[in-house]
Amino acid sequence: MRSKWIRLWATGMMWMGAMLPAAVTSAATLDCLIEPFRIVNVASPLDGVLERVDVERGDLVKQGQVLALVEGSVQRAALEIAEARAQLETAVESGQVRLDYAIRKVASNEKLLEEHGISEREVDDSRAQRDLSRIALVEAQDNKRLAVLDVQRAAAELEVRTIRSPINGVVMERILSPMEQTKQTPIVKLAQLDPLRVEVFAPIALLGKVSVGMAAEVVPEVPVGGVPTARVTVVDRVVDAASGTFGVRLELPNPGYRLPAGLKCKVRF
């Protein structure tokens, strides 16, 4: 009887031991670091002199917001000229008037030819003039379309000199100032703070127990009210042999930028 109870106790302990890794996993608390989701060095695609820079360190920016302008007085003048040309209607209007007149003249001459009032050659001349007027009108219409395209080209050349923010975020650093050359140098450095990125180095004991999509609580070193929840987005498939750890990345929503980047934290899976 006693041996039977011993066997039952041993079986129970083995069962509890088998369940231990899951309990350890669910209670795992690890050090982590909260970082910007991304850092972007914003530069100009062309060399030139900065005309103005509209942001300073700490400014909040929206995607598409103008950050700076590269000097573009020549391009602005070219755009104004192109717009003026595109608005001109005189060539098309005069071409239409000449064609209408040539058509009427052909009709009149053909009638006179039937009455033997003019020669065949005069009718041919009027027909040729009509055809030339039609070609001239088509050319004027083509030039009008080209003028519109020239406006688009000039506007695109000017837009290239307008440096816009590629993200919603905050200005970490203003690197260049007005009148400085943009040659291969970032103008401003931006950080995207919503969402944030949480970096963790987990021990190999958790390998296979942390997976993409898993939720985790993040406790920053500075209280922010409540415990935000992040989700695992990356689990490294290569282990660092020297430290016996592997990298885990989580994505932490940060509406209103209530959490600053750069904080140390604890993460609980």
What are these regions (language model features)?
Residues 206, 221, 239-241, 247, ...:
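Edge-of-domain interaction segments
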Residues 28-45, 149-165, 188-192, 233-239:
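Short beta-strand-turn/beta-hairpin segments enriched in glycine/proline and small hydrophobics
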Residues 74-90, 202-207, 231-239:
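Short, compositionally biased
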Residues 62-167, 175:
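Amphipathic alpha-helical coiled-coil/rod segments that serve as protein-protein coupling scaffolds
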Residues 214-229, 257:
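Low-complexity, intrinsically disordered
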Residues 2-16:
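Bacterial N-terminal signal peptides that target proteins for export
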Residues 33, 51-54, 60-66, 157, ...:
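Surface-exposed patches in structured soluble domains
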Residues 17-49, 229-234, 246, 261, ...:
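N-terminal beta-strand block that forms a small beta-sandwich/beta-barrel module immediately after a flexible targeting
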